[in-house]
Amino acid sequence: MQHLDNLLNEAVANNDLPFVVAMVGTAAGVSYSGAAGSGAGPDTVFRVFSFSKAIGAMAAMILIERGKLSLDSRVVDILPEFGNLQVLQGFDGGRPCLRAPKVQATVRHLATHTSGLEYEFWNADIARYVGMTAHPGMLTGLKAALHYPMASDPGTRWGYGMGIDWLGLVVEAVDGRRIDAFCQQEIFDPLGMTSTGFEVDPARLAGMAIRGEDGRFAPFNLAPPSRPEVYGMGHALYSTAPDYLRFLRMILKKGVLDGNRVLAKASVAVMQADQMQGLLFQKMMSAVPLITADFDPFPGTRVTHSFGFLRNEADIPGRRAAGSLGWAGICNTHYWIDPARDVAAVFMAQSLPFAEGRVMRAFENFERAVYARFVRPA
């Protein structure tokens, strides 16, 4: 325990992070809880951004389990407005060149980031399109913000984007409840995630910082809007470290936590399996360095995507086993789930740029220490 505490304190003392909260758990319970820095603790609420995506995938899986949706349901058959999206093929004289997609995206495409929809932070062409058209940004909370063009045809490559925001709209259309009510009733309440939701008490919200050119952190704010037109299922949740660890432990326990079953074992297996249909994760190249660095968590390793999670297909020496699941939020919240070794963890800060080298080293050091001290040998 002390070694993990020391690693967190060193990361803050070295100015890698302004503060950090970390927790480790197994199917049986919580193994470790620690924090460093003065900005946060276990009760602090974080902007978890893309931690939201796994929750959104689970919401869709609940409907799949109930026979109301399938992995290969075409999005346009549920949301006709999705049929208006076109593929961006470059620019001609400063004008975007658009065409109809060759195939229609499915629910599986949305959950695996193979729908063709990509964020402007990691796609220079989409960033250029947004700049020249004054397209509303994702954090406006406007439904129109989701109507980005596709960067490629569905099913042709992995590209990180707003697919799960669209998946949230699919859930709403199929179920009839707004996505916040659906998640509250079907996920958060049964799992005892009492501090997780789309709205936040400002008194509990962590501060946030961005690293300047001088290497120092300065206050900054990046957050979803309150009471938006649409809640972004891919980015708009707030949560705490203990709450999110409960969600991860439910996955370790194959759909049940504290006697409350929220997914069938078979559904959890589908969520964990490679759903990329032969495609592979591609290194994320930053188009906005102020906000994010390039991101490739396991260079040289075959990496796929399950129904909601990034998945490494080989053991990472000294770290997670093959078949582990994980992802992150843009303000440097990170998590992983290792079903083979029965461990899950969260490592949560509130800083930019995302995935800068010193942050990723601190996270890797923490993960290695967890496996060295808590995890049974393979």
Residue ranges of predicted features:
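Short, conserved catalytic-motif segment at the N-terminal edge
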Residues: 1-49, 68-70, 84-92, 96, ...
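Hydrophobic (often cysteine-bearing) scaffold residues that line and stabilize catalytic clefts
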Residues: 4, 48-52, 56, 163, ...
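Active-site SXXK
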Residues: 5-9, 22, 28, 47-75, ...
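Alpha-helix C-terminal capping/helix-coil junction sites
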Residues: 12, 64-65, 146, 252
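Short, surface-exposed loop or secondary-structure junction motifs
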Residues: 29-30, 77-322
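Short, well-ordered beta-strand elements
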Residues: 31-34, 335-336, 342-351
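Glycine-rich phosphate/pyrophosphate-binding beta-alpha loops
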Residues: 229-237, 324-336, 350-355
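Generic C-terminus detector
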Residues: 351-378
